[in-house]
C-alpha cells in the first residue's frame, strides 16, 4: 500500500457535507407483436408498498451505475443479459420521501419473456403503455422521458430490432415502429 493510500485510509467515506444516495431505475420495453409494453415491479416494501415502479435500487459502494442497474434488474425480475442504455438522471430534491436520492435511469429493448418478482419486489409484470397504473416516486416522469427518448432514437438507430424475433416480416417491423411512434 502506498504512503498516500495509508494516509487516506481513515478518510474512506467520511465527508464534511451531507451527500445524496444514488439509485438506478430500468425502463424495460418489450413488444408482443401488437403493443409496446413496459416491465414493472410491485414494491414489497415502504415507501409506496403495493405500488408499481421500475426495477431499480441503491448502488453498492463497489459497483458502477450500470452494474447496479443490471444487478437490480436480475434481483427484482429475473431478467438477465439486457443491453441497457443510460438516458437521463433525475435529481429533484424531494423525489424520494426517505432521503435525498439521485437516480440514473436506463432503458432497454428486450424480447418479452416470463418475469418473476424477487428481492424487494413482490411481483413483476409486463404492462401495455396505455394500461400502466400510477407509479411510485417520480416514475411517471421517468416513463415519459424514456418514451420520448425511444421515439427520438428510433429515427437515428435501428433500435427496434431487439424487440423482434430473429426472423421477422416487414409487417412485423412496421407494426413495431407504428407502436413506438404512436406511444
Q: Whereabouts are the PLM-identified features?
A:
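Non-catalytic substrate-recognition and accessory regions of acyl/acetyltransferase enzymes
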Residues: 1-6, 103
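Hydrophobic alpha-helical positions that pack around
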Residues: 55, 69, 73
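Short helix-coil junctions and helix-kink-helix linkers
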Residues: 175-183
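NUDIX/MutT-family hydrolases
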Residues: 116-154, 163-176
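N-terminal strand-loop-strand
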Residues: 7-53, 66
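Active-site segment of metal-dependent pyrophosphate-handling enzymes
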Residues: 20-24, 66-70, 78-115, 123, ...
Amino acid at each position: 500500500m502506498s504512503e498516500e493510500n495509508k494516509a487516506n485510509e481513515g478518510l474512506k467515506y467520511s465527508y464534511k457535507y451531507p451527500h445524496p444516495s444514488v439509485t438506478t431505475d430500468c425502463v424495460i420495453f418489450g413488444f408482443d407483436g401488437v403493443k409496446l409494453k413496459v416491465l414493472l415491479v410491485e414494491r414489497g416494501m415502504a415507501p409506496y408498498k403495493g405500488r408499481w415502479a421500475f426495477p431499480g435500487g441503491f448502488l453498492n459502494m463497489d459497483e458502477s451505475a450500470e452494474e447496479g442497474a443490471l444487478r437490480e434488474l436480475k434481483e427484482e425480475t429475473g431478467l438477465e443479459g439486457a443491453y441497457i442504455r443510460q438516458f437521463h438522471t433525475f435529481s429533484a430534491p424531494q423525489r424520494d420521501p426517505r432521503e435525498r436520492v439521485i437516480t440514473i435511469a436506463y432503458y432497454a429493448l428486450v424480447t418479452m419473456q416470463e418475469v418473476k418478482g424477487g428481492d424487494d419486489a413482490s411481483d413483476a409484470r409486463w404492462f401495455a403503455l396505455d394500461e400502466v397504473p400510477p407509479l411510485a416516486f417520480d416514475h411517471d416522469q421517468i416513463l415519459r422521458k424514456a418514451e420520448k427518448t425511444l421515439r427520438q432514437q428510433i429515427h437515428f438507430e435501428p433500435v427496434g430490432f431487439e424487440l423482434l424475433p430473429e426472423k421477422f416480416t416487414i409487417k412485423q417491423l412496421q407494426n413495431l415502429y407504428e407502436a413506438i411512434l404512436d406511444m
